[in-house]
């Protein structure tokens, strides 16, 4: 693997060598169907609002934030399962029956190479899709905007193979069309394995657009007819091969000119110097050239892509998170005193820590009262909070619950009050009410670690150990992020 890119030559024939990839659940380069993903279901709008804190801006993960035409949010269901929620613009799918039929069809797919579609919501004008949440960003992020290290050649080859396997799986299930395949559609799961977003299997039915990217990257037949074909997907796959080879988003026409002129030094990412052999580089360039053929019928099919990419794989025994230089999802982060107390369900220690924290985490999220808003009712609510704080310190939990309830019922907002009442409920052997308050605290302050820790303690006492551990890790991640420490994925 010592050759550099400057000596690559552009060949004409594609090798069809066979090899067995040693990565988990891969046999002869084919993607396997999985059965441990929940069946597709319909969610209520209220469930998805609760999961995303009312579609809060802080929960947006789509490329262009809230300005994106169809915004994607991260969320967390009641059972602590993380989800991605795609919210289409109003009336993007005017025919609710068509939306449901299409979503149910895509929702039957289950592959380890995809961020599987878990469900949808179709209430009134709302059209939402729910998929598995992938916590480790997009290919675009790791390829074009990397922070610690550029993506290694070995990992780039794994990405294109897994992507080809995902497309081949879809093809085998009769889903041959994928809309606007690009580096933002490739996501990384908890183990840092690449997965294809299922959102791209459904397009916006009203505008009918299959490509939102620059026209320079659009398949030529789509420009002529406005229709997407299975061969159009292969063309887009070719543009992704160029992305991975160059580390940049190069227009296909320019890349093909460089290939024809054998100017591959300019085409290839300088970060890859010395990481691959001339023959491997030539093979990838040849495959990209075939995918980008002007005539659609001259492009390879998905099965040919898998066959060509499988023998190029290297270091198949090395896990993806190691190649990516990212922490493993099972890594254990040292817990803070509060996290440790919540993990042990040590309510006395939790009480001492919450009392010391005071209300400093309420800054910026509590009610800001103007002079004109100081009414007798407001003053009464604030007095109730003060009485609740006194009762909290004196461990009079029934009195504290009553006073904090008066404060909340008065329309006042405070995540700390919700957290304190949550702990009072735990002290009073009322874990369900405690969980509700902890969730409400997170609705008010979505990135507050204390709320996650209290959810963990409540879930544990309710006997939901798996969900408790998920919430505990989430709290640890949020606390580490707040303190500027690299978080555990």
Curated annotation (Swiss-Prot):
Biological process, per Gene Ontology: brassinosteroid mediated signaling pathway
PTM (free text): Phosphorylated by BRI1 upon brassinolide (BL) treatment. Phosphorylated by ASK7/BIN2 and ASK9/BIL2.
Keyword Ion transport part of the UniProt annotation: no
Gene Ontology CC annotations of this record: cytosol; plasma membrane; plasmodesma
Any GO molecular function: protein serine/threonine kinase activity
UniProt-annotated catalytic positions: 180 (proton acceptor)
Protein name (Swiss-Prot/TrEMBL): Serine/threonine-protein kinase BSK3
Species per Swiss-Prot/TrEMBL record: Arabidopsis thaliana (Mouse-ear cress)
Recorded name of the encoding gene: BSK3
């Amino acid at each position: 693997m010592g050759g550099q890119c400057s000596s690559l030559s552009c060949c004409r024939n594609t090798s069809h060598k066979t090899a067995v990839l040693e990565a988990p659940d891969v046999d002869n380069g084919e993607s396997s169907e999985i059965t441990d993903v929940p069946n597709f279901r319909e969610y209520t709008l209220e469930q998805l609002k609760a999961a995303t804190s009312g579609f809060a801006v802080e929960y947006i993960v789509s490329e262009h934030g809230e300005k994106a035409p169809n915004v994607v949010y991260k969320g967390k269901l009641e059972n602590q399962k993380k989800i991605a929620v795609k919210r289409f613009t109003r009336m993007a799918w005017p025919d609710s029956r068509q939306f449901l039929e299409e979503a149910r069809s895509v929702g039957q797919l289950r592959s380890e190479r995809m961020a599987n579609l878990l469900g949808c919501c179709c209430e009134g004008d709302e059209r939402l899709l729910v998929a598995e949440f992938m916590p480790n960003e997009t290919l675009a992020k790791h390829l074009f905007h990397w922070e610690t290290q550029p993506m290694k050649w070995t990992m780039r080859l794994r990405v294109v193979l897994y992507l080809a396997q995902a497309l081949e799986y879809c093809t085998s299930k009769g889903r041959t069309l994928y809309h606007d395949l690009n580096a933002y559609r490739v996501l990384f799961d908890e183990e840092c394995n690449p997965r294809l977003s299922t959102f791209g299997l459904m397009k916006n039915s009203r505008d009918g657009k299959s490509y939102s990217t620059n026209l320079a990257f659009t398949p030529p037949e789509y420009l002529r007819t406005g229709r997407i074909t299975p061969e159009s997907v292969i063309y887009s796959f070719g543009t992704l091969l160029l992305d991975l080879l160059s580390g940049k988003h190069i227009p296909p026409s320019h890349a093909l000119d460089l290939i024809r002129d054998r100017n591959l030094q300019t085409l290839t990412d300088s970060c890859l110097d010395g990481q691959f052999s001339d023959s491997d580089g030539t093979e990838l360039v040849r495959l990209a050239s075939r995918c980008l053929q002007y005539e659609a019928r001259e492009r390879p099919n998905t099965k040919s892509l898998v066959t060509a990419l499988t023998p190029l794989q290297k270091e198949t025994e090395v896990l993806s998170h190691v190649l990516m230089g990212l922490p493993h999802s099972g890594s254990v982060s040292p817990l803070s005193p509060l996290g440790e107390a919540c993990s042990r369900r040590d309510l006395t220690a939790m009480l001492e820590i919450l009392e010391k924290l005071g209300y400093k985490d309420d800054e910026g999220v509590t009610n800001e009262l103007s002079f004109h808003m100081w009414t007798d009712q407001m003053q009464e609510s604030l007095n109730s909070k003060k009485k609740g704080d006194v009762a909290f310190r004196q461990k009079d939990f029934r009195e504290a619950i009553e006073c904090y309830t008066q404060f909340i019922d008065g329309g006042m907002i405070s995540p700390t009050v919700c957290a304190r009442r949550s702990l009072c409920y735990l002290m009073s052997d009322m874990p369900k009410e405690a969980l509700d308050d902890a969730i409400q605290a997170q609705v008010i302050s979505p990135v507050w670690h204390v709320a996650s820790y209290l959810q963990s303690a409540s879930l544990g006492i309710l006997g939901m150990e798996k969900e408790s551990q998920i919430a505990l890790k989430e709290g640890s991640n949020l606390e580490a992020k707040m303190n500027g420490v690299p978080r555990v994925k």
